[in-house]
Amino acid sequence: MIKTNIKISFGELRDLYVNLLAVANKKLPIRLSHVISKNMQLISEEVHLIDDCRIKMAENYADKDENGEPKFNDNKYIISDENAMKFNAELNEYYSTTTEIDIYKTSSNELNKLEEQRYDGLSPSEIGALMIILDEESDTN
């Protein structure tokens, strides 16, 4: 396992967390499971801050009731079409903000172990999502 520093946008970081969460409960080789868990711990606080800011933006653009509180429908903010365009533009700009974070990587050889019956398989999209935490040049012990 190698710790490395990368530049990543807020949107990519949020997507990485969602992708790691999606495979975290699968039966995977222990080194791969470990690096997934370590990365989830490393980035979870930052992702929660990103989501808190997204929620504040949504509250700002949401239609308000007579008390000035955001309106909801099915646990979603009600946002007018005009404000939705502004919200999406601001959110996209926010998600493009770049940050530096440390992540852990493991050998891409760990994927070869997925062929064993005792492990769950991963779809091509799941493997693609994990590429950022795989190091093709190392053979970690």
Give the label of every model feature segment:
Residues K3-D63:
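N-terminal interaction modules that seed assembly of large macromolecular complexes
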Residues C53-N141:
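Low-complexity intrinsically disordered segments
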